[in-house]
Design a protein with these regions (language model features):
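Short coil/turn connectors at secondary-structure junctions
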Residues: 1-5, 13, 54-57, 76-77, ...
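Short beta-strand segments
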Residues: 6-11, 61-62, 130
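Short acidic, glycine/serine/threonine-rich loops at helix termini
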Residues: 17-21, 71-74, 141-142
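Active-site glycine-rich loop that binds ribose-phosphate moieties when present
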Residues: 29-54, 61-67
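A broad structural signal for short, well-ordered beta-strand segments within beta-sheet-rich domains
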Residues: 30-33, 58, 121-126
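Active-site rim beta-loop-alpha module in soluble metabolic enzymes
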Residues: 53-58, 62-111
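C-terminal accessory domains and tails appended to enzymatic cores
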Residues: 100-179
Length: 179
């Protein structure tokens, strides 16, 4: 890859996270949870794995307090900036925009100096996608190579993270099509 690192700004915690501002996993009304190779992940963990597939480590994340904790589970060496702290799922105490902008700028500059390695992704990649209801899992179970685990969960095994991601997006779209 021609990139040294990736940086995520404006991120949120995975669905169901206590004190996660607007927490959801990709499609809040559709996806209950996502596990990659046995670990529950949100968008931070999923996107960091996609970057890692390309040899790029996650070096910086800005978001709410809960998301910065989630990011450190993905990559303990990451630089994070918390720009808001949850009062509830839909409310937060936020830094003033000028303060947040400066903190993000400083954090990103510090992260750019790091020499991090991308996380290792074990192949094949197994996804467990749990939907918010069985109708959505019914629709996604039509995707070739998926296996139904229970009423709301499908399993998808892929040779690498990119194929797994494409399968995940297909499952999200199938689940979303059910109203």
């Amino acid at each position: 890859s021609s990139y040294d690192a990736c940086m995520f700004v404006g991120y949120h915690a995975k669905k169901g996270t206590l004190e996660g501002v607007m927490s959801h996993t990709y499609s809040g009304g559709n996806i209950e949870s996502l596990h990659v190779n046995g670990m529950e992940v949100g968008e931070t963990g999923l996107n960091a794995r996609i970057a890692a597939h390309h040899g790029v480590p996650l070096a910086f994340l800005a978001g709410d307090v809960a998301t910065t904790k989630e990011a450190k589970e993905v990559n303990p060496g990451i630089v994070t900036v918390a720009v808001k702290d949850a009062i509830g799922r839909m409310s937060a105490k936020c830094l003033h925009p000028e303060v947040a902008r400066e903190e993000i700028r400083k954090g990103a500059a510090n992260a750019a100096r790091l020499k991090l390695k991308p996380m290792a992704i074990k192949a094949p990649v197994e996804l467990l996608i749990r939907f918010t209801d069985a109708r959505r899992a019914d629709a996604a179970a039509f995707i070739p190579t998926t296996e139904r685990v229970d009423g709301k969960t499908i399993r998808l095994v892929a040779p690498d993270m990119i194929v797994a991601y494409h399968g995940f997006i297909a499952a999200v779209l199938c689940g979303t099509a059910v109203s």
